[in-house]
From Swiss-Prot:
This is Short coiled-coil protein A. It is found in: Golgi apparatus membrane; Golgi apparatus, trans-Golgi network; Cytoplasm, Cytosol. Positive regulator of amino acid starvation-induced autophagy. Residues 1-26 are annotated as: Disordered. Residues 48-95 form a coiled coil. The gene is scoca. Belongs to the SCOC family. Its main location: Golgi. The lineage of its organism: Eukaryota, Metazoa, Chordata, Craniata, Vertebrata. GO terms for cellular component: cytosol; Golgi membrane.
Length: 119
């Protein structure tokens, strides 16, 4: 095992800082330049910005879908109110005609009409 302790003096005899690769060759550790770290930070920042943009897009899409459903509900309600309005107008005309027929058939309203015509 690497990093074995010498029993004679208690010090390490072999310390390897590199991992062995799959093919048995030692892997060499390399330090990254400041430019590479900057590039990595930009990539991380870009990934975070992309994630924020994606979340914002998802939120907006959900909001649009909710508004579309609300609009559909309102449109259906408007159609129902229009239909009810037409029905009530029709009933109002029938009632108006009925009242007019009653008034013309009643002698009370006929005498009032003739008195008002005389004046």
């Amino acid at each position: 095992m690497e990093g074995d302790v010498d029993e004679d003096d208690g010090t390490f005899t072999n310390i390897s800082l590199a991992d062995d690769s799959a093919d048995g060759e030692p892997t060499v550790l390399r330090f990254r330049s400041e430019e590479q770290y900057s590039t990595m930070n930009c990539e991380i920042d870009g990934d975070m910005e992309n994630q924020v943009e994606q979340e914002e897009k998802t939120r907006l899409i959900n909001q649009v879908l909710e508004l579309q459903h609300t609009l559909e509900d309102l449109s259906a309600r408007v159609d129902a109110v229009k239909e009810e309005n037409l029905k009530l107008k029709s009933e109002n005309q029938v009632l108006g005609q009925y009242i007019e027929n009653l008034m013309s058939a009643s002698s009370v309203f006929q005498t009032t009409d003739t008195k008002s015509k005389r004046k």
